[in-house]
């Protein structure tokens, strides 16, 4: 491909000790080193060093000779023997570009993978003068909400900008006036000092220019991905693959064992369904609470006495490889890792101490204290540094912070109750010796999130003052309430609940009151359990910990080898952001995330180095980690946890194909199939083709011999024919909508071979039995022969000119409602 537009230069920014990098770098010593990576890639490394602080800035850029594209990553390293000043707002890209003074300026972008049927939905946003747009990761997973791939189009040209960061990225696009586009992108939160020898990096940025229409830009991107942005095990791009598992029938792998896995493989082959991979998903390891209890990464020898090797050997002997699921980053309680190496784990609530009752046996009611010198934000709750909060129980238990008077006299009581959850709605009280002196509400009865009380009371030695939180409107959820409580005694000493928290020989105790219409101090029962880190059931394996990282590499590598595993599948069913940020000090914000991301990418690079022919499958509750850095190392074989439903998956193929040439999903060939289940299910062509993708996983219950296997064999044979076209140029032929009274269609075209394929779907309530589809990428003067794989049989064998197919359109007739058509075309000669 020839160079069709000038390539941009890297542009990044940060503040260092309050000064702009754009002002600092010209003053620092710099050098440039250029080297050829291969015949198509030139690497340019520019380094600046501040001799005063020892901060080294290194920008590593790669320019491509076969595409008008550039990529870069920026690294910061402390080369001194002392901490650096603060680095903040470390942006991988901060740049602006001239654009025409026209309203014809559009951003093409896509939804991420929220698993709600809107996954990968394409969006077209007009960027008129002064438009400001913000995109980013959600919860620390990069494509939870937004895809991190963007195409700006104006006139007959445009620019693709892609952020590669498997964490919490953020991007802001601003049309400054009408003649400039400003772009700012990077890790969302950075404010840190670097320790001696420490290094961090930005997200990977890719900028690609294109000319023509925006779809041409998308296809230029697809070709770049295939050339430079996808894994190539054994030096080759992944080929379309048919996989199968028994997960629907056995609750993932909970009900699986050696015998039934071998039986399932044999049954597929018995029915003439040649598999590329046998897929063994979650639940194969030691656990006693179901598949989510991950953290003991050993094959359950009760069900698999010799591990997976007998299954792998059996499959290999019959030409079937094995895929096995892992989820190393999430660690559940009561597992080998959590019990033996808690120092390898991150809690989102590190430093948050919780007091609760073992008699109740539940997390709430409780009193919580943030021991940290910094605030903690988690799931919408904000704990100030060195602060107390409390929470009622699910059955109406009141939570109490109790003061016991050390001497007789007059006490000044001050209480401040603050809702610290976004949705706190509760009642609060102050009781003295069982009698109320203050009753109020948080965000109920017209009151706000904060109420205050000041009283003067008489207390004898040993008498009590209770600060109480209830469940307000009868719903205890979200009722985390901050408390500032102070009693100043007759001696002038101020007893502060937060400052004296947990100290011996002081006046404060913590407990709960039994449920009732009003608090009854006589029912006070002290909390008898202290949790130093109030973590939930899951922790995050810290891939930024070198010791933990080394153990994981060696352990997983051994599992792969010993069990004959051919394809490594990694899931990620947890939002890591609160774990990262909960472990950052105020002057180290962003460091935990950065080190985890670097460790994650290095972990995969090491596995790929040790297993050069092995493909990696990236899953994160479906497709929630499909950023470019991840996609360079893996493919998403399960693109969404929204499974099987035809219309949603039609739209997914439509949207994701704009950016990722290879992706996968599963099928039962039945639009009514539940996520889990077994038994005989019908084989519907419409459902099958709606879920067809470059990688296709079968979820049918192969134990059942009453399934229509002849029909399924034909569908799979035709799908394998279709598979050869997925790496062609992609053209959407209709708008993308989830309405059930429409058609949807797209085209994959191979210009090098002058052929292609069209897929079209008539949805259940579409009143039209025919649609005309104007094809793209054809030679007007050429003649094309039509061949039908599915539906629209009236077109089979016809020959049509490229001009007619492009200008008049290919007529597709479907009597079936719903129905699917798969139509090939190939050049046979001139008109």
Where on the chain are the PLM-derived regions?
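Alpha-helix-loop-beta-strand connector modules within alpha/beta enzyme cores
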Residues: 308-315, 592-611
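Aromatic-lined carbohydrate-binding/catalytic grooves of carbohydrate-active enzymes
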Residues: 237-352, 499, 507, 516-551, ...
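Polysaccharide-binding surfaces and accessory modules of carbohydrate-active proteins
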Residues: 1-179, 188-190, 783-796
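C-terminal beta-strand-rich structural cap/linker in extracellular carbohydrate-active enzymes
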Residues: 798-831
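Short, acidic/polar linear motifs in exposed loop/turn regions
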Residues: 79-82, 421, 764, 779
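Active-site-proximal substrate-binding groove within the catalytic cores of carbohydrate-active enzymes
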Residues: 12, 16, 22-24, 202, ...
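Gly-Asp-aromatic-enriched flexible segments
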Residues: 353-516
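Short Pro-Gly-centered flexible turn/kink motifs
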Residues: 192-211, 818-825
